Amino acid sequence: MNTENLLIIDGSSFLHRAYHGYANANIIDESGRQISAIYGLVEMFRKLERKITSTAWICVFDPAKSKSFRYDIYPEYKKNRTKYEDLEYQKEIVPKIVSHLGITTIVDDRYEADDIIGTLAVSLFDKCSSILIATGDKDLAQLVNNKVKLINTMNDEVTDIKGVNKRFNVNPEQIIDYLSIVGDTSDNIPGVLGCGAVTASKLLQEYKTLDEILKNIENLKPSIKTKFINSSKE
């Protein structure tokens, strides 16, 4: 595989978007099961192919049935998400279909797509001139660097280091700490109650890391200090 200009696709993100975007397509297979999301996914790939020139594509999916280690750490993880029966079947068969399109496809029962995408971005860094990650997931902003960029195919917006700075007011390497403070509602992960994006970015601009914020908790404004202490008790 020539990975000089690599495109990594967050297949699970694409499939969920296709499920909602093509909800009225009503496309069924020979057994009468809905496959509108898969049809939409393929259409999204076609549009992507017209927009992007890459020497290699890799598409990564979440496991369809098994749960990652995150559920053991935090049982409430993603508990707020609605399950759609007609999507669950499509999750099971889509990796094989994408593979038949000639696209390198990866799914691992132990890990989510994000984990694998992160591993690929790091392990293939020295072998690539550029890595473009197609996703709508803000978590992956932590991977952005001088070679790695994100593209949101909803609006064709490409996010580089400056783009991360502009959107979050922090650097890519601070995204994990930023999300730890503000929380992630899409994954049902609480942050520091009462600390929003503005507070989080200001704290990280001053102290650089969450560890340093906690080490200097006595120096924080009383109201912010209280929020951190109260959140640590929950």
What residue ranges belong to the model's regions?
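Noncatalytic, basic helical substrate-engagement surface that gates or grips nucleic-acid strands
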Residues: 2-134, 140-158
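Acidic, divalent-metal-coordinating active-site segment for phosphoryl/phosphodiester hydrolysis
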Residues: 138-139, 198
